[in-house]
């Protein structure tokens, strides 16, 4: 049978199933069924297993404990005059044992036997163990709470099509306990991040998602329009400038965990809508915030894996303290034996090196910009173990304090070939910041003459009131979770990743 024919037959089968179930619902509604919401469970399935799993069959018979539970039917089988359901609730399953002679014959045949996979039910009954010692519920009463009109994915094989998993995440969650555990772990990681920040006396804040000027990072914004104000607005690329205004206002230690939006490509490590944490700490520098990040990562790894070693894509990732530190140029030389330190001496040498490596560069690119391009193209993916890369060129660090005329007090943090975080000592000289903004804008306007770029002048005014010595850090929460949960793509740790319309 051809693949196309199989798809057609499958579609017809699903349409027939939908029709049959709609007929059942129509009959139920005539009998007064209205998707009731008055059933309340006494225990969750997880609670029942925790409380009674260690009891023997005889002990449970002696206790004779009754309960009420609810869940979705995910398995159904008959055995003689008995019927067995497996119901699922919040990633936990339990067997329901239904004896036909406990119910009027007509009710059993027309109501209980007619229940389908996917239906959501409430059950009142006694907790017991079968002869094979499986914890179960002996059903005394059963309540249909929600009629499922569409059939569920196959119990054993689940969803095979990866794109359907992303487009119809609810089906993936129903049929795949593993994916539920990943998202539960995501929630746990974010909770632990908040707990850590609270321990360190940081205040969680919220800043605007709609910005009048696109700023905070060098990326394309999503553009929208505010009807009442009659103004173009931008979904935030980064909250950086607003957060630093709060530091100017007097807060010492703040952080924000929220969404950023960048109107750019989609890949295994990029989603246009993503979760970031930004941290700002006054009276500190980039070394201080680097140490804070090291402490946070070790804290999270211990919480998740109970050790300092995790597996990612079959590689052991070791978070042993101290985490390795290298300058950008040191890392390029380490991972590319064909490149020599002399290549970075002047613009002529660096351009020749880039050409030899087939790296496209702009004719006006500076020494630092080309060095960064070489790093991105030849080195990033090779940094597997947790590593802080320092001494970023000043030309690509417009908001960072200078270390010297070549480098900024800046670092990026890499794990498994992914950039996880970016931190630096904040530039707090308003005149220098204004100068850098203007240079950045002139480059943008030169590159794209169709647009008239501008910068946040209010931020400069705020700086003129005085920003204390401050360090800042941005952490890509999604990428960090990818690594801590051993997932190959960012789509696997976002409930509803952005996909093209079909």
Swiss-Prot record:
This is Lysine--tRNA ligase. Mg(2+) 1 binds at residues 412, 419. The gene is lysS. Keywords: Aminoacyl-tRNA synthetase, ATP-binding, Cytoplasm, Ligase, Magnesium, Metal-binding, Nucleotide-binding, Protein biosynthesis. Its cofactor is Mg(2+). SUPFAM superfamilies: Class II aaRS and biotin synthetases, Nucleic acid-binding proteins. GO terms for molecular function: ATP binding; lysine-tRNA ligase activity; magnesium ion binding; tRNA binding. It catalyses: tRNA(Lys) + L-lysine + ATP = L-lysyl-tRNA(Lys) + AMP + diphosphate. The keyword Membrane does not apply.
């Amino acid at each position: 049978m051809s693949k196309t024919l199989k798809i057609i037959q499958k579609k017809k089968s699903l349409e027939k199933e939908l029709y049959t179930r709609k007929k059942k619902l129509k009959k139920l509604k005539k009998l007064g069924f209205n998707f009731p919401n008055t059933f309340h469970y006494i225990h969750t399935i997880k609670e029942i297993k925790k409380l009674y799993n260690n009891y023997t069959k005889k002990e449970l018979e002696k206790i004779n404990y009754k309960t009420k539970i609810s869940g979705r039917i995910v398995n159904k089988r008959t055995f003689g005059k008995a019927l067995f359901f497996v119901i699922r609730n919040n990633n936990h399953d339990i067997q329901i044992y239904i004896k036909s002679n406990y119910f009027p014959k007509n009710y059993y045949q027309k109501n209980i036997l007619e229940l389908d996979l996917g239906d959501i039910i409430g059950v009142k009954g006694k907790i017991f163990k079968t002869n094979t010692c499986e914890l179960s519920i002996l059903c005394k009463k059963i309540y249909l709470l929600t009629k499922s009109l569409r059939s569920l994915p196959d119990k054993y094989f689940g969803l095979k099509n990866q794109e359907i998993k992303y487009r119809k995440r609810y089906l993936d969650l129903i049929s795949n306990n593993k994916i539920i555990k990943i998202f539960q772990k995501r929630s746990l990681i974010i909770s632990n991040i908040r707990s850590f920040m609270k321990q360190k006396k940081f205040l969680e804040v919220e800043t605007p998602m709609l910005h009048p000027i696109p700023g905070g990072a060098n990326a394309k914004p999503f553009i929208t329009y505010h009807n009442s104000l009659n103004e173009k607005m931008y979904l935030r690329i980064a909250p950086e400038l607003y957060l630093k205004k709060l530091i100017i206002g007097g807060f010492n230690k703040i952080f924000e965990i929220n969404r950023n939006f960048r109107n750019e490509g989609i890949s295994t490590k990029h989603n246009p809508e993503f979760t970031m944490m930004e941290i700002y700490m006054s009276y500190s520098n980039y070394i201080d915030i680097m140490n804070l990040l090291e402490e946070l990562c070790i804290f999270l790894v211990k919480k998740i894996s109970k050790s300092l070693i995790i597996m990612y894509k079959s590689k052991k990732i070791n978070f042993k303290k101290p985490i390795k530190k290298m300058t950008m140029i040191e890392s390029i030389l380490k991972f590319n034996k064909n490149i020599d330190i002399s290549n970075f001496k002047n613009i002529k040498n660096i351009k020749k090196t880039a050409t030899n490596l087939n790296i496209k560069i702009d004719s006006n690119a500076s020494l630092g910009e080309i060095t960064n391009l070489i790093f991105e193209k030849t080195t990033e993916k090779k940094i597997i173990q947790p590593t802080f890369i320092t001494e970023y060129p000043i030309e690509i660090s417009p908001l960072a304090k200078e270390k010297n005329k070549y480098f900024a007090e800046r670092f990026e943090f890499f794990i498994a070939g992914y950039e996880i975080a970016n931190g630096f000592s904040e530039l707090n000289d308003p005149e220098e910041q204004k100068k850098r903004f203007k240079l950045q804008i002139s480059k943008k306007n030169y590159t794209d003459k169709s647009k008239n770029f501008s910068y946040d002048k209010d931020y400069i005014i705020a700086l003129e009131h005085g920003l204390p010595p401050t360090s800042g850090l941005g952490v890509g929460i999604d990428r960090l979770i990818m690594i801590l949960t051993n997932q190959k793509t960012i789509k696997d740790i976002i409930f509803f990743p952005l996909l093209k319309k079909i």
